[in-house]
Amino acid sequence: MSFQAPRRLLELAGQSLLRDQALAISVLDELPRELFPRLFVEAFTSRCCEVLKVMVQAWPFPCLPLGSLMKTPDLEILHYVVDGIDCLLAQKVRPRRWKLQVLEMRDVDENFWTIWSGARPLSCSPEAMSKRQTVEDCPRTGEKQPLKVFMDVCLKEKSVDEDLSFFSGWVQHRRRSVHLCCTKVVNYSMNILNFRNILETVYPDSIQVLEIWNMCWPCMVAEVSRYLSQMKNLRKLFISDGCGYLPSFESQGQLVAEFSSVFLRLEYLQMLYMRRIRFFEGYLDQLIRCLKSPLETLALTYGSLDEEDLKCLPWYPSLSQLKQLNLSHGTLRFIRLEPLRALLEKVAATLQTLFLVDCGIGDSKLRVILPALSRCSNLTTFCFHGNDTSMDGLKDLLRHTGRLSNLSLETYPAPRESLDNRGRVISELLTPLQAELMRILREVREPNRIFFGPVSCPCCGMSPTEQLEFNFCLRGRPA
């Protein structure tokens, strides 16, 4: 018998059962586990909601990856699913067969369904796949563990998405038996009141990534600080102030103290991104000294680092193992760069990505950091475009970066000699200068992906942003 034959038999058996929903419901307790995923898909596709409700109560696997089936919110089906869960939660003794620990609403486990539909060989069971997701998050103890609903939160508008609103309301009255878990929470523009309501619903220990793009007002800083202190497993924090808010001198110290103290509780923080956050100018050391564990990523962009801020960076153990450093679009023109050199020396063995884009670094400033830069032997990405550098300065820079054999992406400004009086590139001047710079570099190594001048992808026009996890299309090379 071919591999597809038993799959076809399972499919036919499921379809036959669903023709009589009452029969399907009555036999679920005796239904072989192998039939559950296929029958669930058939019931979902056919919108046999009563069957879905009962199947949830008898689900024989630790995880129900509903999100990979439900590509768009379907409130009717969600109502039946949670009704089934409610029936179970209301029972003092859980059914023998019930193993459900996680309702997965993210689109992360499509393999669970495709394996049992016959789309690919059965290399591992759904139970094994489900356990990979749930063992770490849902350790079994002697007492009943709360059911966990996993979903990501992305808040772009004034109103909340239908599925998030639905689960928030459902979990609100079941806090002891159901946890709404969101590994990633992103707020682009939602007002503070609605954002607060969401944070109060989400189980704080589940949040590993928090991005806030509208950190514009003191009240938002205060609210975020209060909830941030509860996110004990936070790995990545991104905060951005689109308004460029600058507090009064009297309130600045209070904001800094309140926000910095939160970091004492974030033991697992690895990535810190601060974009246009100006209320830390001159007070950065207060935040850095509160970091409990070594960071892998530090991004301080579109801000105005002053000299005191830069001075503190080399001296704290929490910055001694950086893999990514981004100081782009900051004002370094009038600041001594000896502290930056000291920091680069300190992280030379670990640093992989360095962004110094549009920092106002001229030839004299560049010479200060070159010896330390040439020691960063594991550097794979170096972005330096947007700075005011002469041809001689770039030659010197390439002689130092030429020693970095692991570089796979490097961007440099057009030499000052190729610009007109408005700072625009004159291509007729840039071309021969670029050829000379490439010759100098090739004397040491063959570059992989390298750009000179205003950086944009020749294929799609994209350019690296101030964020380190940019998607940069590099299917072609400049001529």
Swiss-Prot record:
LRR repeats lie at residues 15-38, 97-124, 179-203, 204-230, 231-265, 266-291, 292-323, 324-342, 348-375, 376-400. Signal peptide: none annotated. GO terms for molecular function: ubiquitin-like ligase-substrate adaptor activity. GO terms for cellular component: Cul2-RING ubiquitin ligase complex; cytoplasm. Keywords: Leucine-rich repeat, Repeat. It comes from the Eukaryota. GO terms for biological process: negative regulation of apoptotic process; negative regulation of cell differentiation; negative regulation of DNA-templated transcription; positive regulation of cell population proliferation; proteasome-mediated ubiquitin-dependent protein catabolic process. Belongs to the PRAME family. This is PRAME family member 19. The gene is PRAMEF19.
